[in-house]
Amino acid sequence: MKKWLICSFVLVLLVSFTACSPSAEHESIKIGIAESDGAIWNYIAQKAEEAGLDIQLIPFSDYAESDIALANKEIDANAFQTISYFQSFTEKYKLNLAPLGTTYITPMGIYSKRYERIRDISRGAVVSVPDKAFDFGRALTVLQEAGLLTLKNGFNGTGSVDMIKDNPRHLKLKAVRQQDAVSGADVFVMKPSEAKKAGLNPKKHTLKSGGLMSEEEMNLIVVRAEDQDREALQTILELYQADDTAAFIEKEYQGDLVPAFLPLKRLSDWKNEFEH
């Protein structure tokens, strides 16, 4: 009986030591995200827990703050920005950040309750576009793709109305918050998810869809350059770029987001081209 009690006590100590040892603890990773991506990252977080990682999701509404927080080591990674935005922002503010891998592309379309076709848009029509800098730039490109205006050479996906070279219909661009997009405008340039929130019917009110499906508009997971090879972050990237994650995105977002997993080699080639 005494031997049994001693063995039991030793076993309890071993179990307690194992449970409390650093090797058994989950590594904590803080990731800054856009609130609209919560469903995806909750899915990733569940998978990460099985891999021994504890993902803490930090929502940001100001995208610039997310990059600054990453540079200041307040978070370990962020996932919200396109390649073109990342290039422009990090170059402007000299941040030592690096892309880890790509996630998805968000289509952007042209919608209207007043017009049925692009060619029907009248001279002087008011066009609402997103007020966030990089979405504003995307909207300009969508309008150019539709033949409604021409942008200056050197346009890199971000910028202001100063980048417009020709506006033959004299469209009046109105930069607004998403919730105000359909107020006082004839035409709206926005993402499908925003169009639905604004009460638009994609089948009835879409004049042009699927704009900006290029590599430069893929969204990224971004980390500090020194952490690019960090094992935990590489694991998170693998979990994100898995087939089951792509299937989840397609089912959950119904075309509002399109999975786009760029191989790391191609991302490195792009990064080298950007740096040189």
From Swiss-Prot:
Subcellular location(s) of the protein: Cell membrane
GO cellular component: plasma membrane
Residue positions of covalent lipid attachment, annotated as S-diacylglycerol cysteine: C20
Annotated GO biological process: D-methionine transmembrane transport; methionine import across plasma membrane
Keyword Hydrolase: no
Keywords attached to this entry: Cell membrane, Lipoprotein, Membrane, Palmitate, Signal
Membrane topology: Lipid-anchor
InterPro entries listed in its UniProt record: Lipoprotein_NlpA
Lipidation (N-palmitoyl cysteine): C20
Signal peptide location: 1-19
Keyword Signal: yes
Main location: membrane
PANTHER family: D-METHIONINE-BINDING LIPOPROTEIN METQ (PTHR30429), LIPOPROTEIN (PTHR30429:SF3)
Family: Belongs to the NlpA lipoprotein family.
Protein name per UniProt: Uncharacterized lipoprotein YhcJ
Organism per entry: Bacillus subtilis (strain 168)
Gene that specifies this protein: yhcJ
